[in-house]
């Protein structure tokens, strides 16, 4: 198992060398660490969970013209090249295809404990202090406004609406980030998410106060 993990780490580090910094190797490492933390109290296939954590953003659809098949395909081709069992490969591919917040807005036919852990590990990195930093980093990357009081957040976005949004970054908090606490699957992730959610609420309160010149 360790050789497979080591080869995968090297592959991902090389592949994401020039990635946008919210979806780079450091994001992968944080999600990997979250995964291992959750696995301390959850029973699941450790190899599947760790490989998913390492490969889940190997070719994110956001940076490949919305193609949601390229990530699972690249991950599968790599894992096959290092001799990973086909059933494990297919499980990892299914998780990558179904683990995102965007995927959860549609119908998901696939389910496994490993998917739950992957979702939690990735979503934890989208909230709290790092989540705030990543949101504004991606907003800057896409040249979006930080905030526009005239553009109200939308609730209950469809999958297509979420994929195509160009709304200011602050809207992303209301349309996704503040919703993640209640979408966690495991007790470990739920406990961590409570604190990170509270931190984001405090940030938004301060942001709005400064925007309006009240503080």
Where are these regions (language model features)?
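Onset of an N-terminal alpha helix
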Residues: 1-9, 28, 48
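An amphipathic alpha-helix signature
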Residues: 5, 9, 32, 72-76, ...
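Generic N-terminal amphipathic, Lys/Arg-enriched alpha-helix
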Residues: 7-18
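Divalent metal-dependent phosphate-bond-processing catalytic cores, especially two-metal-ion Mg2+/Mn2+ enzymes
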Residues: 16-25, 29-42, 55, 104-215
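Alpha-helical phosphate/pyrophosphate-handling elements in metalloenzyme active cores
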Residues: 19-49, 61, 70, 74-82
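His-Asp-centered metal-binding catalytic motifs of divalent-metal-dependent phosphohydrolases/nucleases
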Residues: 45-63, 71, 92-102
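Hydrophobic, well-structured mid-protein blocks that either form specific transmembrane helices
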Residues: 82-119
């Amino acid at each position: 198992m360790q050789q497979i993990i080591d080869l995968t780490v090297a592959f991902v580090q090389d592949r994401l060398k020039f990635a946008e910094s919210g979806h780079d190797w450091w994001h992968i490492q944080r999600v990997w660490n979250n995964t291992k933390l959750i696995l301390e109290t959850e029973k699941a296939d450790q190899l599947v969970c760790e490989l998913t954590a390492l490969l889940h953003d190997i070719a994110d659809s956001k940076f490949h013209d919305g193609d949601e098949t390229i990530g699972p395909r690249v991950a599968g081709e790599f894992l096959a090249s290092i001799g990973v069992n086909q059933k494990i490969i297919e499980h990892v591919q299914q998780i990558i295809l179904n683990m995102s917040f965007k995927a959860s807005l549609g119908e998901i036919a696939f389910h496994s404990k490993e998917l739950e852990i992957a979702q939690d590990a990735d979503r934890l990195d989208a909230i709290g202090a790092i989540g705030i930093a990543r949101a504004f980093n991606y907003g800057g990357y896409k040249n979006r406004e930080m905030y526009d009081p005239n553009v109200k957040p939308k609730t209950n976005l469809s999958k297509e609406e979420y994929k195509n949004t160009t709304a200011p970054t602050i809207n992303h908090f209301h349309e996704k980030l503040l919703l993640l606490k209640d979408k966690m699957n495991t007790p470990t992730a739920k406990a961590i998410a409570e604190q990170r959610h509270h931190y984001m609420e405090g940030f938004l309160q301060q942001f709005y106060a400064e925007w309006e010149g009240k503080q």
